[in-house]
Protein backbone atom coordinates (compact mmCIF):
# COMPACT_ATOMS: atom_id res chain seq x y z
CA UNK A 1 0.00 0.00 0.00
CA UNK A 2 1.40 3.38 -0.94
CA UNK A 3 1.98 6.08 1.65
CA UNK A 4 -0.76 8.65 1.98
CA UNK A 5 -0.41 11.96 3.77
CA UNK A 6 -1.30 11.34 7.43
CA UNK A 7 -4.81 12.91 7.56
CA UNK A 8 -5.78 11.08 4.36
CA UNK A 9 -4.39 7.76 5.62
CA UNK A 10 -6.33 8.25 8.86
CA UNK A 11 -9.60 8.95 7.04
CA UNK A 12 -9.08 5.85 4.87
CA UNK A 13 -8.52 3.78 8.04
CA UNK A 14 -11.67 5.21 9.61
CA UNK A 15 -13.77 4.50 6.52
CA UNK A 16 -12.41 0.93 6.42
CA UNK A 17 -13.88 0.32 9.88
CA UNK A 18 -17.37 0.74 8.42
CA UNK A 19 -19.17 -2.43 7.31
CA UNK A 20 -18.73 -3.41 3.66
CA UNK A 21 -16.01 -0.82 3.03
CA UNK A 22 -12.65 -2.25 1.95
CA UNK A 23 -9.37 -0.57 1.05
CA UNK A 24 -10.42 0.50 -2.45
CA UNK A 25 -13.83 1.86 -1.44
CA UNK A 26 -12.28 3.64 1.54
CA UNK A 27 -9.76 5.32 -0.76
CA UNK A 28 -12.49 6.38 -3.17
CA UNK A 29 -14.58 7.81 -0.34
CA UNK A 30 -11.61 9.61 1.21
CA UNK A 31 -10.57 11.18 -2.09
CA UNK A 32 -14.18 12.22 -2.60
CA UNK A 33 -14.23 14.00 0.76
CA UNK A 34 -10.89 15.60 -0.11
CA UNK A 35 -12.34 17.02 -3.33
CA UNK A 36 -15.68 18.00 -1.78
CA UNK A 37 -16.44 21.47 -0.45
CA UNK A 38 -15.51 22.00 3.20
CA UNK A 39 -19.18 22.72 3.90
CA UNK A 40 -20.21 19.27 2.64
CA UNK A 41 -17.50 17.59 4.71
CA UNK A 42 -18.77 19.50 7.75
CA UNK A 43 -22.33 18.31 7.17
CA UNK A 44 -21.20 14.68 7.03
CA UNK A 45 -18.95 15.11 10.04
CA UNK A 46 -21.72 16.74 12.08
CA UNK A 47 -24.36 14.21 11.04
CA UNK A 48 -22.15 11.42 12.40
CA UNK A 49 -21.91 13.08 15.80
CA UNK A 50 -25.59 14.04 15.90
CA UNK A 51 -26.64 10.43 15.43
CA UNK A 52 -24.71 9.60 18.59
CA UNK A 53 -25.77 12.68 20.55
CA UNK A 54 -29.37 13.33 19.59
CA UNK A 55 -30.82 9.84 19.41
CA UNK A 56 -31.86 7.61 22.28
CA UNK A 57 -34.07 4.57 22.73
CA UNK A 58 -37.86 4.72 22.85
CA UNK A 59 -39.10 4.23 26.42
CA UNK A 60 -41.83 1.88 25.19
CA UNK A 61 -40.33 -0.29 22.45
CA UNK A 62 -36.54 0.41 22.52
CA UNK A 63 -36.54 1.57 18.90
CA UNK A 64 -34.30 4.53 18.03
CA UNK A 65 -36.04 7.77 18.92
CA UNK A 66 -35.17 11.45 18.83
CA UNK A 67 -37.56 12.07 21.72
CA UNK A 68 -38.72 9.94 24.63
CA UNK A 69 -41.14 7.91 22.48
CA UNK A 70 -40.43 6.75 18.90
CA UNK A 71 -42.58 7.68 15.92
CA UNK A 72 -44.31 4.29 15.78
CA UNK A 73 -45.27 4.22 19.46
CA UNK A 74 -46.56 7.80 19.34
CA UNK A 75 -48.58 7.24 16.14
CA UNK A 76 -52.18 6.79 17.30
CA UNK A 77 -53.15 5.39 13.88
CA UNK A 78 -51.14 2.27 14.60
CA UNK A 79 -52.84 -0.70 16.24
CA UNK A 80 -51.47 -1.20 19.78
CA UNK A 81 -52.95 -4.70 19.99
CA UNK A 82 -50.39 -6.21 17.58
CA UNK A 83 -46.70 -6.02 18.49
CA UNK A 84 -43.97 -7.14 16.10
CA UNK A 85 -40.80 -8.22 17.92
CA UNK A 86 -37.49 -7.66 16.08
CA UNK A 87 -33.84 -8.09 17.02
CA UNK A 88 -32.45 -4.73 15.92
CA UNK A 89 -33.87 -1.26 15.13
CA UNK A 90 -32.86 -1.59 11.47
CA UNK A 91 -35.09 -4.67 11.11
CA UNK A 92 -38.05 -2.28 11.43
CA UNK A 93 -36.95 -0.60 8.20
CA UNK A 94 -37.44 -3.80 6.21
CA UNK A 95 -40.89 -4.39 7.66
CA UNK A 96 -41.96 -0.76 7.15
CA UNK A 97 -40.99 -0.82 3.47
CA UNK A 98 -43.75 -3.42 2.91
CA UNK A 99 -46.35 -0.84 4.05
CA UNK A 100 -48.40 -3.84 5.22
CA UNK A 101 -47.89 -3.79 8.96
CA UNK A 102 -49.93 -1.29 10.95
CA UNK A 103 -49.13 -2.43 14.48
CA UNK A 104 -46.44 -1.48 16.98
CA UNK A 105 -42.91 -2.80 17.44
CA UNK A 106 -40.66 -4.10 20.18
CA UNK A 107 -36.89 -4.18 19.72
CA UNK A 108 -34.92 -6.79 21.69
CA UNK A 109 -31.46 -5.41 20.80
CA UNK A 110 -30.07 -8.85 20.14
CA UNK A 111 -31.00 -12.51 20.13
CA UNK A 112 -30.38 -15.35 22.57
CA UNK A 113 -26.98 -16.90 21.98
CA UNK A 114 -25.60 -19.24 24.65
CA UNK A 115 -22.40 -19.57 22.60
CA UNK A 116 -21.74 -15.85 22.81
CA UNK A 117 -23.03 -15.65 26.36
CA UNK A 118 -26.20 -13.71 25.51
CA UNK A 119 -28.94 -14.77 27.91
CA UNK A 120 -32.53 -13.52 28.29
CA UNK A 121 -31.44 -10.91 30.86
CA UNK A 122 -29.32 -9.15 28.25
CA UNK A 123 -32.25 -8.67 25.88
CA UNK A 124 -34.99 -6.09 26.32
CA UNK A 125 -37.64 -8.69 27.15
CA UNK A 126 -38.78 -7.29 30.49
CA UNK A 127 -40.39 -4.25 28.85
CA UNK A 128 -42.27 -6.53 26.46
CA UNK A 129 -43.71 -8.56 29.34
CA UNK A 130 -44.76 -5.30 31.02
CA UNK A 131 -46.47 -4.09 27.84
CA UNK A 132 -48.41 -7.34 27.65
CA UNK A 133 -49.24 -7.05 31.35
CA UNK A 134 -51.05 -3.77 30.60
CA UNK A 135 -53.62 -5.88 28.72
CA UNK A 136 -53.75 -4.04 25.39
CA UNK A 137 -51.63 -6.51 23.39
CA UNK A 138 -53.53 -9.31 21.64
CA UNK A 139 -50.89 -10.75 19.30
CA UNK A 140 -47.09 -10.85 19.35
CA UNK A 141 -45.50 -11.48 15.94
CA UNK A 142 -41.95 -12.76 16.45
CA UNK A 143 -39.88 -11.44 13.53
CA UNK A 144 -36.43 -12.41 14.80
CA UNK A 145 -33.97 -13.65 12.17
CA UNK A 146 -34.49 -17.11 10.66
CA UNK A 147 -31.20 -18.46 12.08
CA UNK A 148 -30.25 -20.47 15.18
CA UNK A 149 -30.19 -17.47 17.54
CA UNK A 150 -33.37 -15.91 16.18
CA UNK A 151 -35.17 -19.24 16.29
CA UNK A 152 -34.06 -19.90 19.88
CA UNK A 153 -35.28 -16.43 20.84
CA UNK A 154 -38.63 -17.08 19.17
CA UNK A 155 -39.10 -20.37 21.03
CA UNK A 156 -38.12 -18.72 24.33
CA UNK A 157 -40.56 -15.84 23.78
CA UNK A 158 -43.40 -18.19 22.83
CA UNK A 159 -42.95 -20.18 26.07
CA UNK A 160 -42.70 -17.00 28.12
CA UNK A 161 -45.58 -15.05 26.59
CA UNK A 162 -48.27 -17.63 25.79
CA UNK A 163 -49.09 -18.17 29.50
CA UNK A 164 -49.82 -14.43 29.68
CA UNK A 165 -52.78 -15.01 27.36
CA UNK A 166 -51.48 -13.50 24.10
CA UNK A 167 -51.32 -15.13 20.70
CA UNK A 168 -47.66 -15.61 19.68
CA UNK A 169 -46.95 -16.03 15.96
CA UNK A 170 -43.76 -16.46 13.95
CA UNK A 171 -43.15 -14.86 10.52
CA UNK A 172 -43.48 -17.29 7.61
CA UNK A 173 -40.40 -18.95 6.19
CA UNK A 174 -40.07 -20.27 2.66
CA UNK A 175 -38.74 -19.55 -0.80
CA UNK A 176 -38.09 -15.81 -1.35
CA UNK A 177 -40.41 -14.29 -3.96
CA UNK A 178 -38.69 -13.92 -7.34
CA UNK A 179 -36.11 -16.55 -6.47
CA UNK A 180 -35.73 -20.04 -7.89
CA UNK A 181 -36.24 -23.37 -6.15
CA UNK A 182 -32.85 -24.38 -7.49
CA UNK A 183 -31.09 -21.87 -5.24
CA UNK A 184 -32.99 -22.69 -2.04
CA UNK A 185 -31.29 -24.83 0.60
CA UNK A 186 -33.01 -27.91 2.01
CA UNK A 187 -34.00 -26.28 5.32
CA UNK A 188 -35.72 -23.42 3.51
CA UNK A 189 -37.50 -25.84 1.18
CA UNK A 190 -38.69 -27.96 4.10
CA UNK A 191 -39.93 -24.78 5.84
CA UNK A 192 -41.71 -23.83 2.61
CA UNK A 193 -43.37 -27.25 2.46
CA UNK A 194 -44.46 -26.98 6.11
CA UNK A 195 -45.80 -23.50 5.51
CA UNK A 196 -47.77 -24.41 2.36
CA UNK A 197 -51.16 -22.75 1.90
CA UNK A 198 -54.28 -23.93 0.14
CA UNK A 199 -54.90 -22.11 -3.13
CA UNK B 1 -39.00 4.66 2.34
CA UNK B 2 -39.84 4.45 6.01
CA UNK B 3 -39.45 7.44 8.31
CA UNK B 4 -36.24 7.59 10.28
CA UNK B 5 -35.63 9.83 13.25
CA UNK B 6 -34.29 13.15 11.89
CA UNK B 7 -30.58 12.80 12.80
CA UNK B 8 -30.52 9.27 11.39
CA UNK B 9 -32.30 10.33 8.18
CA UNK B 10 -29.80 13.18 7.81
CA UNK B 11 -26.80 10.86 8.23
CA UNK B 12 -28.27 8.45 5.66
CA UNK B 13 -28.69 11.36 3.23
CA UNK B 14 -25.10 12.48 3.84
CA UNK B 15 -23.72 8.97 3.29
CA UNK B 16 -25.74 8.67 0.07
CA UNK B 17 -23.87 11.68 -1.34
CA UNK B 18 -20.66 9.64 -1.28
CA UNK B 19 -19.71 7.79 -4.47
CA UNK B 20 -20.94 4.20 -4.76
CA UNK B 21 -23.17 4.45 -1.67
CA UNK B 22 -26.87 3.85 -2.33
CA UNK B 23 -29.87 3.84 0.00
CA UNK B 24 -29.23 0.37 1.45
CA UNK B 25 -25.50 0.88 2.02
CA UNK B 26 -26.16 4.30 3.52
CA UNK B 27 -28.65 2.77 5.95
CA UNK B 28 -26.21 0.04 6.93
CA UNK B 29 -23.44 2.58 7.50
CA UNK B 30 -25.70 4.89 9.50
CA UNK B 31 -26.95 2.09 11.74
CA UNK B 32 -23.34 1.03 12.22
CA UNK B 33 -22.39 4.52 13.40
CA UNK B 34 -25.44 4.53 15.65
CA UNK B 35 -24.30 1.31 17.32
CA UNK B 36 -20.62 2.29 17.46
CA UNK B 37 -18.99 3.89 20.48
CA UNK B 38 -19.18 7.69 20.56
CA UNK B 39 -15.38 7.75 20.53
CA UNK B 40 -15.27 5.88 17.21
CA UNK B 41 -17.87 8.20 15.70
CA UNK B 42 -15.76 11.16 16.85
CA UNK B 43 -12.65 9.75 15.19
CA UNK B 44 -14.47 9.36 11.87
CA UNK B 45 -16.07 12.78 12.18
CA UNK B 46 -12.74 14.44 12.97
CA UNK B 47 -10.84 12.58 10.24
CA UNK B 48 -13.30 13.96 7.67
CA UNK B 49 -12.63 17.54 8.77
CA UNK B 50 -8.87 17.03 9.08
CA UNK B 51 -8.63 15.90 5.47
CA UNK B 52 -10.12 19.25 4.46
CA UNK B 53 -8.18 21.34 6.96
CA UNK B 54 -4.74 19.79 7.17
CA UNK B 55 -4.02 18.88 3.57
CA UNK B 56 -2.92 21.16 0.76
CA UNK B 57 -1.27 20.76 -2.62
CA UNK B 58 2.45 20.14 -3.10
CA UNK B 59 4.18 23.30 -4.35
CA UNK B 60 6.16 21.25 -6.88
CA UNK B 61 3.83 18.60 -8.30
CA UNK B 62 0.31 19.51 -7.02
CA UNK B 63 -0.11 16.15 -5.30
CA UNK B 64 -1.88 16.15 -1.93
CA UNK B 65 0.57 17.08 0.80
CA UNK B 66 0.41 17.65 4.55
CA UNK B 67 3.34 20.07 4.28
CA UNK B 68 4.56 22.39 1.54
CA UNK B 69 6.16 19.55 -0.45
CA UNK B 70 4.63 16.05 -0.88
CA UNK B 71 6.38 12.86 0.17
CA UNK B 72 7.39 11.95 -3.39
CA UNK B 73 8.94 15.31 -4.21
CA UNK B 74 10.84 15.40 -0.91
CA UNK B 75 12.14 11.82 -1.27
CA UNK B 76 15.74 12.18 -2.47
CA UNK B 77 15.82 8.47 -3.42
CA UNK B 78 13.42 9.17 -6.26
CA UNK B 79 14.78 10.04 -9.68
CA UNK B 80 13.97 13.68 -10.53
CA UNK B 81 14.78 13.13 -14.21
CA UNK B 82 11.61 11.09 -14.87
CA UNK B 83 8.23 12.74 -14.25
CA UNK B 84 4.97 10.82 -14.50
CA UNK B 85 2.01 13.07 -15.34
CA UNK B 86 -1.40 12.01 -13.97
CA UNK B 87 -4.84 13.59 -13.97
CA UNK B 88 -5.75 13.24 -10.29
CA UNK B 89 -3.87 12.65 -7.02
CA UNK B 90 -5.54 9.25 -6.57
CA UNK B 91 -4.02 8.06 -9.87
CA UNK B 92 -0.66 8.10 -8.07
CA UNK B 93 -1.97 5.39 -5.74
CA UNK B 94 -2.42 2.94 -8.60
CA UNK B 95 1.05 3.60 -9.96
CA UNK B 96 2.69 3.35 -6.53
CA UNK B 97 1.10 -0.04 -5.83
CA UNK B 98 3.18 -1.46 -8.71
CA UNK B 99 6.39 -0.53 -6.80
CA UNK B 100 7.99 -0.19 -10.23
CA UNK B 101 8.16 3.54 -10.70
CA UNK B 102 10.94 5.40 -8.93
CA UNK B 103 10.57 8.84 -10.49
CA UNK B 104 8.58 11.91 -9.53
CA UNK B 105 4.99 12.90 -10.32
CA UNK B 106 3.04 15.83 -11.68
CA UNK B 107 -0.71 16.12 -11.07
CA UNK B 108 -2.76 18.09 -13.63
CA UNK B 109 -6.00 18.09 -11.59
CA UNK B 110 -8.11 17.28 -14.62
CA UNK B 111 -7.91 16.60 -18.33
CA UNK B 112 -8.62 18.72 -21.38
CA UNK B 113 -12.30 18.61 -22.24
CA UNK B 114 -13.62 21.17 -24.74
CA UNK B 115 -17.12 19.76 -24.20
CA UNK B 116 -17.03 20.58 -20.50
CA UNK B 117 -15.13 23.80 -21.10
CA UNK B 118 -11.84 22.62 -19.58
CA UNK B 119 -8.98 24.26 -21.46
CA UNK B 120 -5.20 24.08 -20.88
CA UNK B 121 -5.32 27.14 -18.59
CA UNK B 122 -7.49 25.26 -16.12
CA UNK B 123 -4.98 22.43 -15.72
CA UNK B 124 -1.76 22.66 -13.73
CA UNK B 125 0.45 22.59 -16.81
CA UNK B 126 2.40 25.80 -16.17
CA UNK B 127 4.25 24.29 -13.21
CA UNK B 128 5.22 21.29 -15.33
CA UNK B 129 6.73 23.53 -18.01
CA UNK B 130 8.65 25.38 -15.28
CA UNK B 131 9.98 22.11 -13.85
CA UNK B 132 11.21 21.12 -17.29
CA UNK B 133 12.71 24.60 -17.75
CA UNK B 134 14.94 23.93 -14.73
CA UNK B 135 16.71 21.33 -16.89
CA UNK B 136 16.61 18.30 -14.57
CA UNK B 137 13.76 16.45 -16.31
CA UNK B 138 14.77 14.01 -19.06
CA UNK B 139 11.54 12.08 -19.65
CA UNK B 140 7.85 12.86 -19.14
CA UNK B 141 5.60 9.78 -18.94
CA UNK B 142 2.02 10.81 -19.70
CA UNK B 143 -0.24 8.57 -17.61
CA UNK B 144 -3.55 10.35 -18.21
CA UNK B 145 -6.60 8.13 -18.60
CA UNK B 146 -7.02 6.09 -21.80
CA UNK B 147 -10.20 7.95 -22.82
CA UNK B 148 -10.98 10.88 -25.13
CA UNK B 149 -10.06 13.59 -22.59
CA UNK B 150 -6.92 11.84 -21.36
CA UNK B 151 -5.80 11.16 -24.90
CA UNK B 152 -6.37 14.78 -25.95
CA UNK B 153 -4.39 15.93 -22.93
CA UNK B 154 -1.55 13.55 -23.83
CA UNK B 155 -1.39 14.83 -27.41
CA UNK B 156 -1.46 18.45 -26.18
CA UNK B 157 1.35 17.81 -23.68
CA UNK B 158 3.49 16.02 -26.27
CA UNK B 159 3.25 18.98 -28.67
CA UNK B 160 3.96 21.44 -25.86
CA UNK B 161 6.84 19.63 -24.18
CA UNK B 162 8.82 17.99 -26.99
CA UNK B 163 10.15 21.37 -28.25
CA UNK B 164 11.60 21.87 -24.75
CA UNK B 165 13.95 18.97 -25.42
CA UNK B 166 12.42 16.26 -23.20
CA UNK B 167 11.37 12.77 -24.22
CA UNK B 168 7.57 12.45 -23.92
CA UNK B 169 6.15 8.92 -23.60
CA UNK B 170 2.64 7.53 -23.18
CA UNK B 171 1.75 4.54 -20.97
CA UNK B 172 1.12 1.32 -22.90
CA UNK B 173 -2.42 0.33 -23.80
CA UNK B 174 -3.59 -3.20 -24.47
CA UNK B 175 -5.33 -6.22 -22.98
CA UNK B 176 -5.33 -6.15 -19.16
CA UNK B 177 -3.26 -8.94 -17.61
CA UNK B 178 -5.43 -11.84 -16.42
CA UNK B 179 -8.27 -10.82 -18.71
CA UNK B 180 -9.55 -12.60 -21.80
CA UNK B 181 -9.39 -11.43 -25.42
CA UNK B 182 -13.10 -12.19 -25.63
CA UNK B 183 -13.92 -9.32 -23.26
CA UNK B 184 -11.70 -6.71 -24.89
CA UNK B 185 -13.30 -4.08 -27.13
CA UNK B 186 -11.98 -3.44 -30.63
CA UNK B 187 -10.15 -0.21 -29.76
CA UNK B 188 -8.25 -1.94 -26.95
CA UNK B 189 -7.39 -4.87 -29.22
CA UNK B 190 -6.14 -2.55 -31.96
CA UNK B 191 -4.03 -0.69 -29.35
CA UNK B 192 -2.69 -4.05 -28.18
CA UNK B 193 -1.76 -4.97 -31.75
CA UNK B 194 -0.04 -1.63 -32.27
CA UNK B 195 1.82 -2.02 -28.99
CA UNK B 196 3.02 -5.58 -29.69
CA UNK B 197 6.53 -6.51 -28.58
CA UNK B 198 9.01 -9.00 -29.95
CA UNK B 199 9.41 -12.07 -27.74
From Swiss-Prot, chains A, B:
Function of the protein: May play a role in DNA repair. It seems to be involved in an RecBC-independent recombinational process of DNA repair. It may act with RecF and RecO.
Gene Ontology biological process: DNA recombination; DNA repair
Zinc fingers typed C4-type, residue spans: 58-73
SMART domains assigned: TOPRIM (SM00493)
Record family assignment: Belongs to the RecR family.
Domain of life per record: Bacteria
Keyword DNA repair assigned: yes
SUPFAM superfamilies, sorted: Recombination protein RecR
Residues of the Toprim domain: 81-176
Annotated InterPro entries: DNA_Rcmb_RecR (IPR000093), Rcmb_RecR (IPR023627), Rcmb_RecR_Znf (IPR015967), TOPRIM_dom (IPR006171), TOPRIM_RecR (IPR034137)
Pfam families per UniProt: RecR_C (PF21175), RecR_HhH (PF21176), RecR_ZnF (PF02132), Toprim_4 (PF13662)
Name of protein: Recombination protein RecR
GO molecular function: DNA binding; zinc ion binding
Organism field: Solibacter usitatus (strain Ellin6076)
Keyword tags: DNA damage, DNA recombination, DNA repair, Metal-binding, Zinc, Zinc-finger
Amino acid sequence: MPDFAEPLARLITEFKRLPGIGQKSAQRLAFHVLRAKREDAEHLSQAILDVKDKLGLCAVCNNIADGEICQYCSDSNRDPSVVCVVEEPHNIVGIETTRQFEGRYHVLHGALSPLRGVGPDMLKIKGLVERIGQGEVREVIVATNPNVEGEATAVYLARLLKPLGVKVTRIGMGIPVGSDLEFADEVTISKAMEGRREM
